[in-house]
Regions:
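An alpha-helical, amphipathic repeat domain used for nucleic-acid recognition
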Residues: 1-236
Length: 236
């Protein structure tokens, strides 16, 4: 079998800003190694020096295999970094997305490990971001946020820490939850005002429960807005 040789080594396409300085990228500069088979493989400048790659040089099969693996790794890392450039993500989200793109598991694991070590992947930072964004939108309570985080692969301990930091026992945080719940109730009341009081309360409570608000927040919100008053007066 004729040995594979290098026909050209040229600069690769421009990577993302994060890719240029991320883990396992060496100097971060990327090259395209063109083989005489027509195949193009991405490697870093450091890879070129480390493997002694030169135009016209013949490559042993094990070197070709190493370059192929390196190309696959760099491609997967670039995809992951592009996803992270859009918004923070959990490590499990990256794992799932790389799997959907048919990235081999061992390469995906290596990418996730390297990006975690470099600080680009951080489940706690992602959880804090997610909680902050969802609370700012005033749409969901802490139980729903915890469920969302767990669904995205964040551990229970990390999810609880992020929620504790955001909500905890702080009166201001509880007030923010109640304001969010009240906004949902006010919007729903327009469609529910003709219902009997007991049925209206059940529907509003179910709405807030689905959105992840605690029983305490639900009761305080409904009482503050006044929808519990007809029931409480009839009980008295």
């Amino acid at each position: 079998m004729r040995p594979t040789s290098i026909t050209a080594i040229r600069p690769a396409g421009r990577p993302t800003a994060a890719a240029r300085g991320s883990a396992s990228g060496g100097s971060g500069g990327l090259c395209c190694v063109v083989l005489d088979t027509g195949r193009r493989l991405r490697v870093t400048i450091d890879d070129v020096a480390r493997c002694g790659l030169l135009e016209g040089a013949s490559l042993a099969p094990e070197i070709v295999a190493r370059l192929v693996a390196r190309d696959a790794y760099l491609g997967a890392r670039e995809r992951a970094l592009r996803l992270l450039a859009i918004r923070p993500r959990s490590a499990d989200e990256i794992r799932v997305r790389l799997g959907q793109q048919r990235v081999p598991r061992e390469i995906a694991r290596a990418v996730i490990a390297d990006l975690t070590a470099a600080g680009y992947l951080d489940d706690l930072a992602f959880a804090r971001f997610w909680v902050t964004q969802r609370r700012a939108a005033r749409r969901y309570g802490p139980r729903r946020l915890r469920w969302d985080l767990r669904r995205k692969g964040v551990s229970a301990a990390v999810a609880d820490q992020a929620l504790s930091e955001a909500v905890g026992g702080d009166e201001e945080a509880r007030g923010a939850d109640e304001r969010a719940a009240a906004a949902l109730v006010q919007r729903a009341l327009a469609a529910d005002r003709r219902l009997p009081p007991d049925r209206r309360v059940r529907r509003l409570a179910a709405l807030l429960e689905r959105r992840g608000f605690t029983a305490e927040t639900i009761a305080r919100t409904l009482r503050t807005i006044g929808v519990l008053a007809p029931l409480e007066s009839s009980d008295g």
